[in-house]
Amino acid sequence: MSELEQIRLANIERNKALLAALNLPTEAKKESVDPEVAPKKSRKRNSARLESPDDGSDDSAPRTRRKSRRLQGLDPEANALKQEDLGGSGELKRLMQQLNGGVKKERLSGDLSLKEMLTKTGLDEKEWSASLGQLFGDGSRVSQGDFFDEIVKKEEEDTKDIDIKQSRDNLSGLQLGKMSKVTKERIYITAVHPGTDKRIVLAGDKIGVLGIWDVDSDNEPLQLQLHHATIPALCFDQNSNDILYSASYDGSVRSLELKTGKSGDVLDLEAKKNASVGVSDVANPQPHLLYASTLCGHLIRKDLRTKSTEYETLILGEKKIGGFSVDPINTHLLATGSLDRSMRIWDLRATETARTIPGGEVIDTQFQMPHLQAIYNSRLSVSSTDWNLAGQIVCNGYDDTINIFNQSDYFLDMLNDGNGTEPVKKTRRTRNSKLAEPEISDQELPEIKKPSVRIKHNCQTGRWVTILKARWQQQPLDGVQKFAIANMNRYIDIYSGTGHQLAHLGDALMTAVPSALAFHPTQNWIAGGNSSGKMYWWE
C-alpha cells in the first residue's frame, strides 16, 4: 500500500470519528444505484413533468426536519454544539474555535470611525486615507466655488490686494437681468457681441441653428439654420465686429454679416477627398487668417482670401482637439486641449514632415507638424484652453481641475530639468514687444511639471450638459484678468488670474446649468446658455 493511500484511509477514519462525536441522527438510507447499470431516463418531457420522481425512499419512514432554535426558546446565537457533545475531542474543539474566530459576535452600535471599521489594521491613518481618496476621487463632485462665502471670509483677513477686493465687490453684485429661449436645442457655444451700444448674444445649438438675441429688445430671438450639424465654436472677425464665423461638426466654417444677413462658405472640408471632417473650434487671430481644429487631431490654416476648398492641414495628434487658443500677443503660438490627456503649446512658425506624434504614435507622413513648444500631461482629457493678454493659459478637463499657467511655466520651468540649470530671465510682455523664446532641444520633451494655480472644480457634465469651458475676459477695463466657468450646482464661478474667486452667481430662476458661458470682452456682462436652449443674461 502506498504512502498516499495510507494517508487517505487515515483521513477517512478520522472523519468518521469526528462525525460519531457529533451524535447526529442519521437519515433513512437511500437505495444505492449503480450508475453503470442504472436505466436511462426517458426523454419524454411532458410525461416526465407529470410523474413524481422515484428516489427509492420509503414515504412512511420518519425524516429529519430542521427546527428553529428561536421557536424552541433557545439562544439562536449560541453554539449548537454543547461542551459534552464534543466528546472531549481536542481536535474538534480546535476546529470549532477556528471557525468562530475565537470571538463572540456582537451587534455594532453607536458612532464608528472609519479606522474602526477597517478589516485590516496594518495600515496607518495616512495610508488608508490615501487609499480611500484614490477610490472615490477625493470628492470629485465638489467645486471650490461651492464654498465661496467661507473663502471670502478667510481671504478678507489675508488678502491686501485692493483690485481683487474691488473686483469681487463689483462682480458679486451682478444680477440676473433677463433670460430668453434663444435656440431650439442644447446650446454648445455662446458669444457676446463686442459692441457696447447694443447688447447682443449669439448661440450655436446642437442641430446647427444660430440664435441671435437682442437683450434690450422685447422681440423674439432670431434663429438661423446655418449648418446641418452641431455648432461648437463662434468667433468675430479681426477687422469687423459685424462679421461672425461659425464652425460645425459638418466639416464647414461659414461667415455671417450681421448687418445684411448674408452668409457664405469660408471652409469646406467635405469637398476635398480624404479630408478631416468635423470642426471643433475656430479662431481669427490675424486679418485674412483663420485657424480651425478638427475632431481627429488636425489643425487647418486658412487664408480667407482664397477659395473655401483651399487650405493647409497641420497634424497635431490622432485624437479629438476639444479646443484651442491663439496667443493674442505672439500669434504664432497656439495652445490645444485634446482627448489624448494633454495640453500642448505649438510654435506655428516652424513645421516639419510629421513622422511620429510626441509620445511615440506613428502617423501619416503626408502632413506637416508644427514645433512643439511645451506639453502638460493631465490625468484625463483636456476640454479647453484659453489665452489672455497677460500671457496666462487657463485649461480645464475631466480631471476636475482648473489649471492656470503663467509665462514662467511654459517658457522657463520646462528648461529646468532638476540638474541645477538656471532658468532664463523673464521678459516683460507688452503689445509692442514680444517675448524672446528660448531654444529647446528636440531630444528632450519640453514637459510642464505643474501649473502656477490649480483650482478644484467639478467638470463631470454627463450626457445632457454641454462640456464646461473656462473663458477669459479678453480686454478687462478694470485691469483684473478674470475668467468665468459654469458650476454644476447651477451657478457661475468667476476667478482671477491669481486663482482668487471673485463671484459665485446664482438665482432661483436659473434652474439649469449655464454650461456655455461667455464674457463681454470689456464690460462685466456674462451670458450663459443651458441644455434646453435658454440663455441667461447677467449684468
UniProtKB/Swiss-Prot annotation:
Biased composition range(s): Basic and acidic residues: 27-39
WD repeat feature ranges: 182-223, 226-268, 316-356, 377-415, 462-505, 508-539
Residues covered by region (Disordered): 22-89
GO biological process entries: DNA damage response; regulation of DNA damage checkpoint
Pfam families xref list: WD40
GO molecular function annotation: DNA binding
Protein's UniProt keywords contain Repeat: yes
Gene3D superfamilies: YVTN repeat-like/Quinoprotein amine dehydrogenase
Matches recorded under SUPFAM superfamilies: WD40 repeat-like
PROSITE patterns: WD_REPEATS_1, WD_REPEATS_2, WD_REPEATS_REGION
PANTHER family: WD REPEAT-CONTAINING PROTEIN 76
Job description of the protein: DNA-binding protein that binds to both single- and double-stranded DNA. Binds preferentially to UV-damaged DNA. May be involved in DNA-metabolic processes.
Disulfide bonds: none
InterPro entries membership: WD40/YVTN_repeat-like_dom_sf, WD40_repeat_CS, WD40_repeat_dom_sf, WD40_rpt, WD_repeat_DNA-damage-binding
GO CC annotations on file: chromatin; cytoplasm; nuclear periphery; nucleus
Cytoplasm listed as a keyword: no
Family: Belongs to the WD repeat DDB2/WDR76 family.
UniProt keyword annotations, A-Z: DNA damage, DNA-binding, Repeat, WD repeat
Protein name as catalogued: DNA damage-binding protein CMR1
